[in-house]
């Protein structure tokens, strides 16, 4: 495979210049492209990201409960958030993907972008140390840490369940009513039924979980009117 171009430029964008540039190249290599891919680095980066964000939240919110801290952390380290950061860095321009992933637009896929961000954190840890990782991660997350609050971190499914339980209502029933598209780009249609609404509410997304959350959010909005 040809080397990835413009890695020093990516280093400047990230705010870190690698001593071992091969680590950055490996962090950007999807398993579809080479045997020496980024999954082990992703494993490292996932753990480092979790401890850095956990520590930041612990000190930022001294009165927050364990549950609140866990929910805020989940919001900040989720794949969607990591993919947003990756897009800010235009990380898709630097990914090394196999022919199949290239053809299917893998450089735009949230899961691939998120995994690469975690792998980069793991690569920086091996190239430097955890304190360097901490400084960089906190800089990347600065604006997000500034606005996150202990409230409203529960996902729509949890909020809907708690709302119904508070009124001693039966729990919602979620049913997948349709799955379309090819295996790498499926679309899920899920309906959510609750006793308070005559008709089921539909959610559509690229995963069952997301579709359920969309449906739950719509149900919440309707029953609270």
UniProtKB/Swiss-Prot annotation:
Record InterPro entries: dsRBD_dom (IPR014720), RNase_III (IPR011907), RNase_III_dom (IPR000999), RNase_III_sf (IPR036389)
Cofactor: Mg(2+)
Cellular localisation: Cytoplasm
Main location: cytoplasm
GO BP term, example: regulation of gene expression
PROSITE patterns: DS_RBD, RNASE_3_1, RNASE_3_2
Positions annotated to bind Mg(2+): 42, 115, 118
Domain RNase III positions: 7-129
Reaction catalysis annotation: Endonucleolytic cleavage to 5'-phosphomonoester
Entry EC number(s): 3.1.26.3
Domain DRBM: 155-225
Claim: Oxidoreductase is one of the keywords in the record: no
Keyword rRNA processing: yes
Keywords: Cytoplasm, Endonuclease, Hydrolase, Magnesium, Metal-binding, mRNA processing, Nuclease, RNA-binding, rRNA processing, rRNA-binding, tRNA processing
Catalytic residue list: 46, 118
Subunit structure, interactors included: Homodimer.
Family recorded in the similarity comment: Belongs to the ribonuclease III family.
Name used for this protein in its record: Ribonuclease 3
Species for this entry: Shewanella loihica (strain ATCC BAA-1088 / PV-4)
